[in-house]
A protein has these predicted regions:
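Active-site flanking residues adjacent to catalytic metal/cofactor-binding acidic residues
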Residues: 23
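Rhodanese-like catalytic fold shared by cysteine-dependent sulfurtransferases
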Residues: 1-20, 28-74, 81-116
Length: 116
Protein backbone atom coordinates (compact mmCIF):
# COMPACT_ATOMS: atom_id res chain seq x y z
CA UNK A 1 0.00 0.00 0.00
CA UNK A 2 1.11 3.53 -0.56
CA UNK A 3 0.28 6.85 0.96
CA UNK A 4 -1.99 8.95 -1.21
CA UNK A 5 -1.56 12.70 -1.22
CA UNK A 6 -4.84 14.57 -1.57
CA UNK A 7 -5.45 18.24 -2.25
CA UNK A 8 -6.90 20.34 0.54
CA UNK A 9 -9.99 20.89 -1.66
CA UNK A 10 -10.90 17.19 -1.39
CA UNK A 11 -10.94 17.10 2.42
CA UNK A 12 -14.55 18.27 2.85
CA UNK A 13 -15.67 15.26 0.80
CA UNK A 14 -14.33 12.94 3.54
CA UNK A 15 -15.38 14.81 6.69
CA UNK A 16 -18.73 13.11 7.31
CA UNK A 17 -17.79 9.72 5.88
CA UNK A 18 -18.16 7.02 8.59
CA UNK A 19 -15.40 4.96 6.93
CA UNK A 20 -12.86 7.77 7.25
CA UNK A 21 -11.03 9.10 10.30
CA UNK A 22 -9.23 12.41 10.01
CA UNK A 23 -6.22 12.58 12.33
CA UNK A 24 -4.57 15.85 13.34
CA UNK A 25 -0.96 15.14 14.36
CA UNK A 26 -0.15 18.71 15.42
CA UNK A 27 0.51 19.72 19.02
CA UNK A 28 -2.57 19.73 21.25
CA UNK A 29 -2.50 23.53 21.64
CA UNK A 30 -2.80 24.07 17.89
CA UNK A 31 -5.50 21.40 17.66
CA UNK A 32 -7.55 23.11 20.37
CA UNK A 33 -7.29 26.49 18.59
CA UNK A 34 -8.51 25.29 15.21
CA UNK A 35 -8.91 21.95 13.43
CA UNK A 36 -10.79 20.12 10.72
CA UNK A 37 -14.24 19.08 11.94
CA UNK A 38 -14.29 15.84 13.97
CA UNK A 39 -10.53 15.32 13.62
CA UNK A 40 -8.88 13.19 16.29
CA UNK A 41 -5.71 14.63 17.84
CA UNK A 42 -2.81 12.16 18.00
CA UNK A 43 0.31 14.28 18.46
CA UNK A 44 3.20 13.59 16.11
CA UNK A 45 5.76 12.70 18.80
CA UNK A 46 3.35 10.23 20.39
CA UNK A 47 2.37 8.70 17.04
CA UNK A 48 6.01 8.45 15.94
CA UNK A 49 6.92 6.65 19.19
CA UNK A 50 3.96 4.26 18.86
CA UNK A 51 4.80 3.43 15.23
CA UNK A 52 8.49 2.93 16.08
CA UNK A 53 7.48 0.50 18.85
CA UNK A 54 5.42 -1.48 16.36
CA UNK A 55 8.36 -1.69 13.96
CA UNK A 56 10.97 -2.44 16.65
CA UNK A 57 9.08 -4.68 19.09
CA UNK A 58 5.74 -5.51 17.50
CA UNK A 59 4.02 -3.77 20.43
CA UNK A 60 0.84 -1.81 19.77
CA UNK A 61 -0.19 0.81 22.34
CA UNK A 62 -3.73 0.95 23.65
CA UNK A 63 -4.38 4.35 22.05
CA UNK A 64 -2.99 3.26 18.68
CA UNK A 65 -5.23 0.18 18.74
CA UNK A 66 -8.25 2.30 19.70
CA UNK A 67 -7.67 4.89 16.98
CA UNK A 68 -6.28 2.75 14.16
CA UNK A 69 -7.84 -0.61 15.02
CA UNK A 70 -9.79 -0.93 11.77
CA UNK A 71 -7.58 -1.43 8.72
CA UNK A 72 -10.66 -1.20 6.49
CA UNK A 73 -11.02 2.50 7.33
CA UNK A 74 -9.28 5.30 5.48
CA UNK A 75 -7.08 7.48 7.68
CA UNK A 76 -6.35 11.05 6.61
CA UNK A 77 -3.41 12.51 8.50
CA UNK A 78 -2.49 16.17 8.56
CA UNK A 79 0.03 18.44 10.25
CA UNK A 80 0.85 22.13 9.77
CA UNK A 81 2.42 21.95 6.29
CA UNK A 82 2.10 18.30 5.27
CA UNK A 83 5.69 17.15 5.82
CA UNK A 84 5.45 15.15 9.05
CA UNK A 85 2.03 13.79 8.17
CA UNK A 86 3.50 12.46 4.91
CA UNK A 87 6.24 10.65 6.86
CA UNK A 88 3.70 9.08 9.22
CA UNK A 89 1.37 8.26 6.34
CA UNK A 90 4.15 6.36 4.56
CA UNK A 91 5.05 4.39 7.71
CA UNK A 92 1.42 3.50 8.38
CA UNK A 93 0.86 2.52 4.75
CA UNK A 94 3.80 0.13 5.06
CA UNK A 95 1.97 -1.44 8.02
CA UNK A 96 -1.06 -2.08 5.82
CA UNK A 97 -3.20 0.96 6.60
CA UNK A 98 -5.12 2.94 3.98
CA UNK A 99 -3.68 6.40 4.54
CA UNK A 100 -3.90 9.74 2.86
CA UNK A 101 -2.25 13.03 3.68
CA UNK A 102 -3.22 16.58 2.82
CA UNK A 103 -0.84 18.39 0.47
CA UNK A 104 0.24 21.55 2.28
CA UNK A 105 -1.29 20.40 5.57
CA UNK A 106 -3.67 22.43 7.69
CA UNK A 107 -2.18 25.70 6.43
CA UNK A 108 -3.38 24.84 2.91
CA UNK A 109 -6.88 23.81 4.00
CA UNK A 110 -9.47 26.47 3.14
CA UNK A 111 -12.57 24.29 3.32
CA UNK A 112 -15.87 24.71 5.09
CA UNK A 113 -15.30 22.22 7.89
CA UNK A 114 -13.21 24.04 10.49
CA UNK A 115 -13.88 23.81 14.22
CA UNK A 116 -12.56 26.66 16.36
Amino acid sequence: MSCEMISSRKVDYYVNDPYVLIVDIREREKYLKSRIKDAYNYEYEHLKCDINNIYAYGKVSFEFRQVFGNKDKIYILYCDRGVTSLLMCEKMSALGYKCKTIVGGFEAYKGNCIDN
